[in-house]
From Swiss-Prot:
Pfam families per UniProt: DEAD, Helicase_C
Record note on domains: The Q motif is unique to and characteristic of the DEAD box family of RNA helicases and controls ATP binding and hydrolysis.
Primary location group: nucleus
Motif stretch (DEAD box): 364-367
Residue ranges, compositional bias (Basic residues): 1-22, 766-782
Residues covered by the Helicase C-terminal domain: 478-635
Compartment(s): Nucleus, Nucleolus
Protein name as it appears in the record: ATP-dependent RNA helicase MAK5
Annotated segments matching region Disordered: 1-24, 71-164, 762-782
EC numbers, comma separated: 3.6.4.13
Domain Helicase ATP-binding: 228-426
SMART domains for the chain: DEXDc, HELICc
A biological-process GO annotation: rRNA processing
Amino acid sequence: MAKQGKNKVSKPRKPPTLKQKLKKESKVVKAKDLQWKLVDIPDNLGDYEGFYGLEEIDGVDVQIVNGKAEFIVRDNGKVENKSKKEETNENGENNMDVEDNETPEVEDEKPTEQEEEEEEEEEEEEEEEEEEEEEEFAGFEDDENNQEDANTSERVSNNDKDDKLAESNDELNAVSFANLDLPLPDDNEINLPNWQEGDLGSSISAYTLYGLSQLDFKKPTPIQKETIPIALSGKDVIGKATTGSGKTLAYGIPILEKYIQSLNLIKQNNKDKKINHPTGIIFAPTRELAHQVVDHLNKLAKYSPLSTRGIVSITGGLSIQKQQRLLRHGPGIIVATPGRMLELVQGDSELAKRLASIDIIVLDEADRLLQDGHFDEFEKILELFGKNRPKSKSIEWKWQTLVFSATFSRDLFRKLDRHQKGKSSSLMGNDEIVQLLNEKLKFKDKKPTLVDANPKEIVSGQITEALVECGPTERDLYLYYFLLMYKGSTLVFANSIDSVKRLVPLLNNLNIPAFSIHSSMIQKQRLRALEKFKEASQKNEVAVLVASDVAARGLDIPNIDHVVHYHLPRSADVYIHRSGRTARAGKEGVSVMFCSPQEASGPLRKLRRLVAGNSNKESRLNMHNDVKLLPIEMDLVSQIKPRVEISSKLADASISSTATRKEDSWVKQAAEDLGLDDLSGLEDFEDDIIKKQRKRKEGKMLSKDETKALKYELKTLLANPIKKNTRKSYITSGLQNLAHQMVTGAHHDDVLGHEKVNALSDLKGSKNKNKKIEKKRISKKK
């Protein structure tokens, strides 16, 4: 029995857990023994708010024991010994055996049986305690062999991961050279005679031409034809063209060609296989425009050596950490808004040095970027790039600058409702434009090349402008009339966010799919609203996007048939860019203004003088004789008026109830934070204006029964069709033969007895349809 007691069978020794490993590998050190590092403060941060000599440390845990802080670090002594052994093995020193036999002797000594039993008992006790605390980890410790295999496989996989990460970092720094040896497209697949002629064809690579052919861009626009050869020669360019004229490709193609040239140089010089800086940075005034530019350039660069990671957008409203990772990957082209780019560059001096080596800087919609208040951030970015730009033979002393916009005029930015002293001109001379931009941008060339593709146009000649005269309270009525009569996708602009929020439920109540986009929405909400609008415009005959001026600049929303100015814009440049959302890529479109009598006498007259007059004021410039009045059929307006009134009441009630609910919840939350229970006397401290606003909102609110009754009444009205001529007793009587229209499919879907109408054809001044019908009818009788 005694022998059996001595020779007791011990449990198989379990591998140490993660907690045990960390406990063995960690040690407590004093604060002064830690390896502190000085914080590198960028030069552009000045005195860093008075903080000097800051130090930091990584990989240290802090534990509070009996009120004192203990600093815990991993013991890296074993790692250092291994590195020393590797060095001695490589050098082949004679005393290698002595060193090897000295240090491991203590570790390799076999412990006695008693020590082994004591260690095993201690480890078993620790493991039992840990199993009670962390039951979820018990399943990994069932089989010793499996655990050892898992540990070895983990080591191998970790080593493989490290190798793969190192390889991927090399690839990312070189902007993914997997496509460097991409074969050139076959010339037979490229059939673009208009792109391949003259200086333009000799300067564009086969990759870009193939991309243009796949996108079905068969002919360059005037601004593209004139600016691309100049930009490819390395000169600074100022491009002026109307909205929708293809300015994105006018600067996108030169940047892409410059990138391809850099790759060819790398292919020739095998010594240097890294592109440490982006080829170009494109600055856009709005986030939506920046994302749109990235989308357009990705479609073109899809068939070129530029990888999918090669073009990135850096804008506000999205994760800054993700954008920092994207910039570490070394993109070839960056599209950014000035605010977010300045934030990233100021906080990272290495990034500022890398980006300062760029070849091309582009200002898209430059008139907005150079306005007072908008240029400060961009000016700081240029200053940082100038300070950090390296002096090297391979990098030019100054980057190339490309500037594009539809408008260059101080007068266009002035408020239309303000009195202007003296007579103002709508356009600036070419010398004035160059001088103004040179003062702010400091071009590389002494005199940059200015290309004016449309010297006699501000609003595109493809846009037909129209006017609807209405009272201030009748805008909803005439907006519904326009959307009801003229099918298609419509973009409605309002001057205030409150108006945008009110119009969407008003139109939805009238069975018109409407979506909103404004500056109070976060970036993801804006992009989601744009996607929903695009889907609705493809599915339905009518789709409406109600927007503030955040959507006025640069956005290329496909197939916009009409632009409606629910409010007259505050300045002429806003009107130009709003109207430019339609009639893009050579198509035609309609721009309609709703104007009250008060606006017609002042702001409208100033707007027409700025937009339609040239600098000499001798003739019209926008190729339109005057703004045409939209034809309105008052008998139809009177029939739809009850619908709009009910829908307006429902929309106002929903908005008022939502606003009141938010205010009440905010007041209650503030009272809870302050520890107040009784809020009965709070109204005595409210301002008179706030009281009036609250009473106005409460007056618009409806009860549940009232809301149900109004919705039922509106549903009944929408079910009854509108009639062209209510006095007709038979469908074949009158000037319009309803039976014939229904058979031929020419009848209006929402108005009985009315033909299908098109806003563009109605405004172009075709012959009177009623007169034609009367003549045909008279000739038939004869």
